[in-house]
């Protein structure tokens, strides 16, 4: 009866195979290696995807820059065109005044000698009034000068003269009228400035 346990142990030892353990460990190592390779492929795919996203973002940035540059060029062209032709309304109105001036001259040349001078004066006076109205329409007005205190911001002194009735520093005579548009001087009035009566 004592021999049976030994036989059972021997039988169990015979059933244990170390090669099977080695084979199992080999399969585990192979699985780990395969998993690592799969992980490397996943990282490569991720890098490829990220590179694609970066390239796409770069394309969008370049496209946005190109659109912005085109907008700036178009805006610059439009601004230049507006500045270039900003005076068109004024020119149109002045051309109408020129037409009326030519009509006044033609009427004076076809009239008799006596009527010619009077008609010319009247016609030119009317044209001048029309021209002043056109200038006023475009916010262009004559700078007050004669009898005013000399102001270098609006007046240009071309000479001085004594005057018994006009105080020193006052404008005694206007040689060429000055004009301003809104609050900006287009050209200063050229004036003669009084030095007073000279008694001092």
Swiss-Prot record:
InterPro entries: GrpE, GrpE_coiled_coil, GrpE_head. Belongs to the GrpE family. PROSITE patterns: GRPE. Signal peptide: none annotated. It comes from Rhodopirellula baltica (strain DSM 10527 / NCIMB 13988 / SH1). Residues 1-17, 34-44 have a biased composition (Acidic residues). Keywords: Chaperone, Cytoplasm, Stress response. Homodimer. Participates actively in the response to hyperosmotic and heat shock by preventing the aggregation of stress-denatured proteins, in association with DnaK and GrpE. It is the nucleotide exchange factor for DnaK and may function as a thermosensor. Unfolded proteins bind initially to DnaJ; upon interaction with the DnaJ-bound protein, DnaK hydrolyzes its bound ATP, resulting in the formation of a stable complex. GrpE releases ADP from DnaK; ATP binding to DnaK triggers the release of the substrate protein, thus completing the reaction cycle. Its main location: cytoplasm. It is found in: Cytoplasm. It comes from the Bacteria. This is Protein GrpE. GO terms for molecular function: adenyl-nucleotide exchange factor activity; protein homodimerization activity; protein-folding chaperone binding; unfolded protein binding. PANTHER family: GRPE PROTEIN, GRPE PROTEIN HOMOLOG, MITOCHONDRIAL. GO terms for cellular component: cytoplasm. Residues 1-49 are annotated as: Disordered. It holds the Pfam family GrpE. One of its GO terms (biological process) is protein folding.
